Structures are given as structure tokens and as C-alpha cells.
């Protein structure tokens, strides 16, 4: 049990509730309740409800927090050293590992991910938009540097993420897993980079 110290600020208490709720979701999945969180924290359920009016609100806040951490890491990698191509690859591979290790391989968490995606929680929709924005910025930078071909960066980012869905979409990762036919994330990234470098129609196959 993690007792809540009386002197904690509301922000610190809110963060504690989120942390414990995430731990319980990893253990119990969708069965985790407000009462479970309150018991773990040594609080009353009524006190937890002061911060989150429902189990749904708390679950969505946890999703927003976890996905927000992935976005923060994506932005850090996107702003790091190296070419736009290298940073694009780093962002996509990071997303793959986060989704596989945190959202798919932990079965209880995956239960909640499935619910969140089927119900189109706002956190999921915000995550998609943020991912697209990160990739669009990298595409625009790559175009300025001559790494990528012409085209609207936002459109190219959306199409690229769709083409790479098998390495960042939790449901697709769960379906395919580590089967022999599954491409490693690096191979998918390489394919996407070739398309960004030559965004026009592919030349006909000459059989060479």
C-alpha cells in the first residue's frame, strides 16, 4: 500500500492515483476498480472520486498518461542528432517496442487497449494526431535537406504511418506477433523511407 501523505499537493495526489491505477491495470486489466485504487493508496473511494469522477475518467487519464510518455519520447528522438531519415526510423522503432512490450505483451493491459480502441477514447485519437505531427515535421525537414521527395508533409506522414501500421498498431502487433512471416520493424522503416525518397509512382519492374 502506498499511503497518501496529507501534505501532498492535489497535483501530487493526482499523479499518485495515476501511478497506482496503471499498476493495477497491469495486474487486473479492466477489472481494476476505483475501490482497488483507493485501497492501495490508503484513501477512501470518495477521495479518489474527487480527482476522477468515474472509473472511465480514470482509465482514460491513465491511457493519456502512458501514450503521452510515448509521444514525449518520440519528440525527444525527433529533435535529436542525425538525419531526418535516421530520426524517423528511431521514432518508429521506439513506438514498436513500446507498443509490443507495454501494450501487447502484458495481457491485462492489452484488454484495456482493446476497449480503448474500440470505443475510440480521446486519448487514442490524440495519440494518432500527435504521431502524425511528429512524422510530418520530420518529413518536412527531410524535404528541406533533400532527403525526401516533394509532397504535402501532412499527407505523406499519414500515408507513411498507415503503411507502417504493422509495427505501431497494437492490434496488428498482437495478431502477428513474432511469426516467421513478420517483418522486423527496421525492414518496415526501410521500405517507408524508400517511398518517402521516391514519393511518385514506382518505376515498372524490368525483371532486373
What are these regions (language model features)?
Residues 1-40, 57-60:
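Basic, helix-initiating cap at the start of DNA-binding domains
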Residues 1-4, 90, 129-145, 162-208:
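C-terminal peripheral helix-coil segments that are non-catalytic and often amphipathic
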Residues 25, 33-34, 45, 55, ...:
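Amphipathic alpha-helical segments enriched in hydrophobic/aromatic and basic residues
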Residues 29-30, 50, 145-148:
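Helix-turn-helix/winged-helix DNA-binding modules
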Residues 42-52:
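Short hydrophobic/aromatic patch on the recognition helix
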Residues 61, 75-104, 156-160:
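Hydrophobic alpha-helical connector segments
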Residues 68-71, 118-145, 154-158:
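Amphipathic alpha-helical packing segments from all-alpha helical-bundle domains
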Residues 87, 99-119, 169-173:
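Amphipathic alpha-helical segments used for helix-helix packing
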Amino acid at each position: 500500500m502506498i499511503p497518501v501523505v496529507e501534505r501532498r499537493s492535489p497535483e501530487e495526489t493526482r499523479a499518485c492515483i495515476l501511478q497506482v491505477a496503471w499498476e493495477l491495470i497491469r495486474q487486473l486489466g479492466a477489472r481494476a476498480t476505483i475501490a482497488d485504487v483507493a485501497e492501495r493508496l490508503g484513501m477512501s473511494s470518495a477521495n479518489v472520486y474527487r480527482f476522477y469522477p468515474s472509473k472511465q475518467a480514470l482509465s482514460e487519464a491513465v491511457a493519456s498518461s502512458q501514450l503521452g510518455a510515448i509521444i514525449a519520447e518520440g519528440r525527444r528522438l525527433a529533435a535529436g542528432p542525425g538525419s531526418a531519415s535516421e530520426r524517423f526510423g528511431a521514432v518508429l522503432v521506439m513506438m514498436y517496442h513500446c507498443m509490443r512490450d507495454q501494450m501487447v505483451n502484458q495481457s491485462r493491459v492489452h484488454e484495456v487497449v482493446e476497449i480503448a480502441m474500440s470505443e475510440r477514447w480521446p486519448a487514442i485519437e490524440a495519440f494518432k494526431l500527435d504521431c502524425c505531427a511528429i512524422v510530418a515535421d520530420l518529413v518536412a525537414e527531410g524535404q528541406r535537406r533533400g532527403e525526401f521527395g516533394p509532397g504535402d508533409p501532412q499527407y505523406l506522414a499519414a500515408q507513411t504511418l498507415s503503411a507502417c501500421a504493422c509495427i505501431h498498431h497494437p492490434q496488428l502487433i498482437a495478431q502477428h506477433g513474432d511469426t516467421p512471416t513478420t517483418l522486423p520493424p527496421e525492414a518496415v522503416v526501410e521500405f517507408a523511407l524508400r517511398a518517402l525518397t521516391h514519393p511518385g509512382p514506382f518505376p515498372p519492374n524490368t525483371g532486373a
